[in-house]
Design a protein with these regions (language model features):
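Single conserved hydrophobic/aromatic residue that forms the stacking wall/gate
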Residues: 1-6, 11, 185-188
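Functionally engaged cysteine thiol sites
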Residues: 3, 10, 117, 143, ...
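Ferredoxin-reductase
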Residues: 5-39
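FNR/FR-type flavoprotein reductase catalytic core
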Residues: 27-172
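Local cysteine-cluster metal-coordination motifs and their immediate loop/turn environment
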Residues: 169-187
């Protein structure tokens, strides 16, 4: 049996169903991709704290994801939508083929895209997208590569916008004991 250690994914647990959004990029995620409906799966989840939901569902919240870091934002978007809000997503990837389930995000709210190769949306990184110059967001949640999240956090800090980041690190225990999930930080 394969061990899945700390891969970013979206887990929706509703009405006795477990729904996973994963990118099959390692041994553990490839094993998950081979599962069929009715197969048995031992899970220890949820781990960590997750994102803070907005108190006011009408709050203009931007969910920024890069690479496989977009997966947890899908769950957050569902939670916001179920509370009557309409999330905005800013998703980045190397190419359009690297974007995970774009249509699922589009069902939940506004979706803005950047690709490094200009194959979809605006060319560049998420922090280069024109929506950041046009719209005023009251909160930002981000998940993805560390350099991207640092850029997003700096953008938010410079504008006085509350920003939450979600680590995409490999985390062996998920409980804090092995310290893989610990990160030294300073204000952006």
């Amino acid at each position: 049996s394969a061990c899945l250690v700390g891969s970013e994914m979206c887990i929706r647990d509703r009405q006795n169903e477990l729904w996973l959004l994963i990118a099959m990029i390692g041994d553990g995620t490839r094993q998950l991709g081979k599962l069929h409906v009715g197969d048995t799966l031992n899970c220890l989840y949820p781990l960590g704290n997750g994102f803070t939901l907005p108190v006011d569902p009408s709050e203009n919240m931007l969910l920024v994801g890069g690479g496989v870091g977009v997966a947890p934002l899908l769950h957050l978007g569902h939670e916001i939508k179920e509370r009557g809000g309409e999330p905005s997503f800013l998703l980045g990837a190397r190419t359009k083929d690297d974007l995970l389930e774009l249509d699922l995000f589009q069902q939940l709210g506004h979706v803005y895209v950047t690709t490094e190769d200009d194959s979809l949306g605006e060319k560049g990184f998420v922090t280069d997208h024109s929506v950041l110059k046009k719209e005023k967001f009251s909160r930002i949640a981000t998940c993805g590569p560390k350099p991207m999240m640092m850029s997003v956090a700096r953008y938010a800090h410079a504008r006085g916008i509350e920003c939450e980041v979600s680590l995409e690190n490999k985390m062996a225990c998920g409980l804090g004991a092995c310290l893989c999930c610990c990160l030294l930080y300073t204000s952006p």
